[in-house]
């Protein structure tokens, strides 16, 4: 039986999140987690993203792709930060969108989530950001990430 929305709220409300925070959350909870992406509490919306990233189900992965298009910056940051834990194709789809996000914080987390397992197109985007992004700090982060990806 799926956890109710109040049960999920309670479970995700740990002051200091740990693995236990996401324990027992699975495919039956995806719809409730989707509703939490719009919660007025930003921290709860971001924890819903991280909970979705722990679920090995297609509907959870599609919810994460949708989260990457959220109007809420904190939800997009959480989607970017969780991209490195997802299957490569889903990670590529999320990172392709978020590496071009207008918010530097979102781009920073997308850069940091990119790895050698991502597609050539995503890795090439890191190289482009490292060379030409208008934000000096993001260029530096991208340069470090590009170097890290290139190392065996």
PLM regions with names:
Residues 1-7, 25-38, 57-69, 88-100, ...:
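Amphipathic alpha-helical scaffolding segments comprising HEAT/armadillo-like alpha-solenoid repeats
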Residues 5-15:
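HEAT-repeat alpha-solenoid elements in large eukaryotic scaffold proteins
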Residues 18-21, 48, 79, 110, ...:
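Conserved hydrophobic register position within alpha-solenoid helical repeats
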Residues 40-41, 71-72, 102-103, 134-135:
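Short inter-helical turns and helix N-cap capping residues of alpha-solenoid HEAT/ARM repeat scaffolds
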Residues 42-54, 78-81:
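Non-membrane alpha-helical segments in proteins
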Residues 131-152:
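Eukaryotic acidic, Ser/Thr-rich intrinsically disordered low-complexity regions
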